[in-house]
């Protein structure tokens, strides 16, 4: 993404960035010999991610009272396939692909509000990434942090401390649904 932001690359969707990274890693570690079909299948593992245990049920509860919108750096086909595979009950998929900016760029959040015909102050960014929440907050969104202890794997400790600027802090999606009455 930094190469796109710096102008080294034109706008590039995440699937293509993932493929560039994969190709570079395979070359770096001398892991050749995969067919193009195998490389494509490996690169598309992102399309087949399993959901976190609280995601499907918690999002379904939120959906009973609110629109559940995915706002991601992932391209639309990746997010659509992920939702289908994991059973994620999103109402709408908004992608950095449609804004031609990646998250943490203010244009992504402004584009989301525009696509939903909602004023910024009626939008809430729900995420396990503080940087994403901070960027959305700077644009005018409300924020809800959902703690995800394994977000970066079992051997890393994520920063899950509550920050004063967060509007809501939840232990998981079910806790968030409880807090907002869903």
Specify the residue positions occupied by each region the protein language model found.
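Asp-based, Mg2+/Mn2+-dependent phosphohydrolase catalytic module
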Residues: 60, 74-182
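Short histidine/acidic/glycine/proline-rich micro-motifs that form metal-
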Residues: 9, 46, 99
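Conserved donor sugar-nucleotide recognition element shared by glycan-biosynthetic enzymes
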Residues: 18, 51, 105
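Substrate-recognition element of Asp-dependent hydrolases with the DxDx(T/V) motif
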Residues: 34-85, 93-96
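Residue-level preference for long, well-ordered alpha-helices that form the structural scaffold
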Residues: 11-14, 51, 125
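Alpha-helical structural context
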Residues: 28-29, 65, 85, 115
